[in-house]
Amino acid sequence: MISVTPEADLPPKPVKVVVAEDEVLVRLMVAEVLRGEGFQVFEASNGQEGISILKTMPVDVVITDLRMSSRADGLELARYVRTHCPGISLVLASAQAPPITEDLTFDAFFIKPYPPEDIANWIRRRRTSTRDHAESGLG
């Protein structure tokens, strides 16, 4: 006999997060904290690697440094997310102020250096508010 488990009884799927950062230590630290919080993390050392990940699998959140020195920067990755991946939460990080452009919107901005736990907390709050919105019949 086949038993079917109601969807409500299934454990929640882990949030899939791309961390695009060219500074190795920053990327590793953010990824480690997010993994410790139960998120599934994919690392990219530049914008092009981030775009490649997005082309191969669905993700929930993209966190990108704006200024990366090699092969596509974070701004290119952010524009790709907004153009090709509607519904993905976009988090920008930089030591400088966020760019003011009419063609780019983002969901959060963190000024470097930032505690990686702040991003983990933001993702959890975002997920909770999105789930509450959907359950209310408004989403």
Language model features: what each stretch is:
Residues 65-66:
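Active-site residues of response regulator receiver
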Residues 93-94:
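Hydrophobic/aromatic residues positioned on beta-strands within the core alpha/beta folds
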Residues 43-61:
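Acidic, metal-coordinating helix/loop segments flanking the phosphotransfer/catalytic sites
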Residues 55-57, 80-88, 99, 104:
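Conserved phosphotransfer cores of two-component systems
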Residues 49-52, 72-86:
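Short amphipathic alpha-helix used as the core "switch/output" element in two-component signaling
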Residues 1-18, 111, 115-139:
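Non-catalytic signal-transmission and effector/linker regions of two-component phosphorelay proteins
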Residues 24, 45-49, 117:
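Acidic phosphotransfer microenvironment of two-component signaling modules
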Residues 23-42:
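Two-component/phosphorelay signaling modules centered on CheY-like receiver
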